[in-house]
């Protein structure tokens, strides 16, 4: 029995050694270590390494993982994607394959927050504001073509605008010169009857030269909807209007000067026309008189009769409203000579149709404005009233206007006040 027990123990030990042959630490003490035991455990087959359960085998065994690890993207990349601009995202989406586009677009939309949307809106608003400012600067920089920052296209636009402005100025200057030359060939004809037309007027002036054109002015249409041009063509004139004016343009300047002979002639009963050059204004001021406080319904014939005694009258003009044709209450009388003007000034405060007239010399508006603007001219025309050089004293001697003497007199008065204290001292001494 004892032998059988010993054999059983030996068998158990051998079985344990067969199950764990590599485990030199557990099964055998450190004195039983054999050379090459570690190397043999390292270079053994897979089935031996998997089957071993000892400590040494577990340390040096390299077991392959049965499940492969799942690779998760780094969180930094997601942060960069959120901070990218819309343009970079669009370019990256174009480069990606078509199969991956829809899934990633959905992710990008989900990742955008409200704050990011607000930032994008602000950036777009700032970009639009910058564009508007650039447009305004381009319009305002007409004189800054020489700057290096200006683009070539902008310079071309500015040059074109300057060229148009210069061309318009040249056209205006040319038109002014043409009008000036045309005015020298033009004759003003006033106080024409309403029934007068172009044929009658041309036949009246045809003996002096060829007529280029005839224009009627100071027409008042019968209806408010009609223009003056249509009223002149259709002859639909206001019934209260009795006279009109016209301009006759000759082809030669000599013909216009000869046509002045018709000034004062009667073209119809009660209508004495006045003829004058359109360019002549200076000589008219010296021979004309301003008449104010006129009745509103007065006619030229009544004013002419009132000033007949002063001399031969060349023309009478009443200033009327352009829309209604009613007189504004003042007018002008043009005489043949300047001597008649002195006689007409004596008719100041004379009555006409129950109104006292105000008669004055006719003054050029430009000269009158210059006198008002220059105070020196006013002082020259009006001498000071305070200085009378011919005034005399009661003794008959002229007064001395030397300012220094007056100042000395004032000083002597002050000295006299001081002297007034001296006799008091003398009285005390006495």
Swiss-Prot record:
The keyword DNA damage does not apply. Residues 1-55, 72-123, 134-153, 365-395, 411-430 are annotated as: Disordered. Pfam families: RRM_1. Residues 23-34, 113-123 have a biased composition (Basic and acidic residues). GO terms for cellular component: chromosome; nucleolus; nucleoplasm. SUPFAM superfamilies: RNA-binding domain, RBD. This is RNA-binding protein 34.
């Amino acid at each position: 029995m004892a032998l059988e027990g010993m054999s059983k123990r030996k068998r158990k030990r051998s079985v344990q050694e067969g199950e764990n042959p590599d485990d030199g630490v557990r099964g055998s003490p450190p004195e039983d270590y054999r050379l090459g035991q570690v190397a043999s455990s390292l270079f053994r087959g897979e089935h031996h390494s998997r089957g071993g359960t000892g400590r040494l085998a577990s340390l040096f065994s390299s077991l392959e993982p049965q499940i492969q690890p799942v690779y998760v993207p780094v969180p930094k990349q997601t942060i960069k994607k959120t901070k990218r601009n819309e343009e970079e995202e669009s370019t990256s989406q174009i480069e990606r394959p078509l199969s991956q586009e829809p899934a990633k677009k959905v992710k990008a939309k989900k990742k955008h927050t409200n704050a990011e949307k607000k930032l994008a809106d602000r950036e777009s608003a700032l970009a639009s504001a910058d564009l508007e400012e650039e447009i305004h600067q381009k319009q305002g920089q007409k004189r800054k073509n020489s700057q290096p920052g200006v683009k070539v296209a902008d310079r071309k636009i500015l040059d074109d605008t300057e060229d148009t402005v210069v061309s318009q100025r040249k056209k205006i200057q040319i038109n002014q010169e043409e009008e000036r030359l045309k005015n020298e060939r033009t004759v003003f004809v006033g106080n024409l009857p309403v029934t007068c037309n172009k044929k009658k007027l041309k036949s009246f002036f045809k003996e002096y030269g060829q007529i280029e054109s005839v224009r009627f002015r100071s027409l008042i249409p019968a209806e408010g909807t009609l223009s003056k041009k249509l009223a002149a063509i259709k002859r639909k004139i206001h019934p209260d209007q009795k006279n009109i004016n016209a301009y006759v343009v000759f082809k030669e300047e000599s013909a216009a000067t000869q046509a002045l002979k018709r000034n004062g002639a009667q073209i119809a009963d009660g209508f004495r026309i006045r003829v004058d050059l359109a360019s002549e204004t200076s000589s008219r001021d010296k021979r004309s008189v301003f008449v104010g406080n006129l009745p509103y319904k007065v006619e030229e014939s009544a004013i002419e009769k009132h000033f007949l005694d002063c001399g031969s009258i060349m023309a009478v003009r009443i200033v009327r409203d352009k829309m209604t044709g009613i007189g504004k209450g003042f007018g002008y009388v043009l005489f043949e000579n300047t001597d008649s003007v002195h006689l007409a000034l004596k008719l100041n405060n004379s009555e006409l149709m129950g109104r006292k007239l105000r008669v004055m010399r006719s003054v050029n508006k430009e000269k009158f404005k210059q006198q008002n603007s220059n105070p020196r001219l006013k002082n020259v025309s009006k001498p000071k009233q305070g200085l009378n050089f011919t005034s005399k004293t009661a003794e008959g001697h002229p007064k001395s206007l030397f300012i220094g003497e007056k100042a000395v007199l004032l000083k002597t008065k002050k000295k006299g006040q001081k002297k007034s204290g001296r006799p008091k001292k003398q009285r005390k001494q006495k």
